[in-house]
Amino acid sequence: QYAHEYLLMGNECITQAHDARAAIANYDKALSLDPNYIDAWIRKGITLFNSKEYFDAENCFNTAVSLHPANFKAVYNRGKLRLKIDNTEGAIADLDKATSLKPEHAGAHELFGDALLRVGKEVEAAIQWRIAEELRKKKS
């Protein structure tokens, strides 16, 4: 109950005040009340990622994935982070899983394509990009 309130306050720190430090303090408070609160781990990870604190962000996403291996947001955001820090194999594994968990997510297919291109899999990358493009066309 209270952990959720701190999560919401953390989200407001980002959306209203653009204050990442205050947001992280609220996510930490939520996690002190409920260490298994996956949404708080993910939001903290995203906030750290956006602040370019990649090591700490990856630790948050790793915790979230270990708590719930089939959580799309946890797997997708860790894959996105791994692509950013050039852990291409890790990114490929996560983004492949993310596209399986949520096949309708265009962004996951696009990033999966980007990761595949980095290891020279141009044909597979093009397939993922085409899927992303088709999904975006459907939405508009």
Predicted ranges, named:
Residues 3-4, 38-39, 72-73, 106-107:
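Helix-start (N-cap) detector for alpha-helical repeat units in TPR-like alpha-solenoids
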Residues 15-29, 50-63, 85-97, 119-131:
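Structural signature of tandem alpha-helical TPR/SEL1-like repeats
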Residues 30-46:
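Short, charge-rich amphipathic alpha-helical segments embedded
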Residues 110-140:
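Terminal, low-structured helical/coil segments at or just beyond the last alpha-helical repeat
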Residues 11-12, 46, 80, 114:
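Residue-level recognition of tetratricopeptide repeat
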